[in-house]
């Protein structure tokens, strides 16, 4: 029996790893354990509850005001004890978080094999996104098995000298999650409030966008709201107090913008499915929205998901107020442009990524 441990700590990781946990547990060939770091606490627990997953280990590292130093040190110290106790044959980590980086580093020190889910995403700008671009490149050096969501991700890994025999294009597990969470008969009072309008879903929280860029983003949205009476915005706001302060200053006095607490994953995915278009600086939404046929304006200067840009489902609009406004306005005014983006092909797979990963692991001597 192969001892496989999955380690994750944030809400986005959990959304993409929980379907894989459930798929692995279907097979008697695997002894599966789950360790969460609690890098996000409340938001992580919501996802675990949605997928009905009980972690075997919880490092509970979350504290107010932690720096990247604190997070990394705490994970390294605590995950070491768990790894020494469990002695897994393989540890699976996801993406580019501090949890992923610190866990992979601990595995390297203990000579435990690492499998990297969502491997090969790159901007090649070490400062954007920060610190995620460094994290995923570092994990790429450590990982023995690389599960790339797309061919572009695979090519990135090959250019970096990774072993072709251990790179697998699987699609993105985010699409697997959507197949579980999105419901045709879903109801929520907020969606009732927005049902006679064009609903815009907004997410904004990235570290590199704090300060002036975020204020610029919000100013563009407020300008659109002032001009288009048939548009409403729902913004499930991040817990970061800097984000909350900026949102209150720029968006707080408009009755067609609802700033709400973070949604659990089932609610959030169904809000996306019922929206008209999406404005975001998130990574995961760039993968999820195309599967739902929703155009996405990406409020960042770079993206590690060029597949969506190439396919036409995403448009990179940066953090300049005028640029965001013009692209937002175009999609509201031009049906042809809107339809081109909403009907573009989804480059992130068909929702069978977890099955593919498990099949690969079944055939590997790990």
Q: What do these predicted regions represent?
A:
Residues 1-235, 240-366:
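Nucleotide-activated sugar donor-binding and catalytic core shared by glycosyltransferases
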